[in-house]
C-alpha cells in the first residue's frame, strides 16, 4: 500500500528535486556523505514528515563541510512510541 504524504511534504520533496535537477549539475558533486544530502532530505521527509524531516535535513547539511570526514549516514528509522492496546 502506498504511503500518502502531506502537501507540505510534497512541496519540500519537489523543491529538493528542483535542486537536484537544476542547481546540483551546475555546481558539481560536493556532498561528503552517502546518501547525498539531497537524497537524505527526500528520504527524511518521506519517513518522518515535513517538520522532523526538515530538521534532520538541516542538521545533515550543517555537517556537510570540509572539516567533516563524511561517510555513510542514513536517515534514522521512525520510532513508533505508541503502546499497543490490550
From Swiss-Prot:
Protein species of origin: Pasteurella multocida (strain Pm70)
HAMAP family: UPF0161_YidD
Coiled-coil portions: none
Record PANTHER family: MEMBRANE PROTEIN INSERTION EFFICIENCY FACTOR-RELATED
Subcellular location: Cell inner membrane
Mode of membrane association: Peripheral membrane protein
Protein's name in the database: Putative membrane protein insertion efficiency factor
Domain of life the protein comes from: Bacteria
Cellular component per GO, a single term: plasma membrane
UniProt keyword Membrane, yes or no: yes
Function: Could be involved in insertion of integral membrane proteins into the membrane.
Predominant localisation class: membrane
SMART domains the record matches: Haemolytic (SM01234)
Similarity-based family: Belongs to the UPF0161 family.
Record's keyword terms, sorted: Cell inner membrane, Cell membrane, Membrane
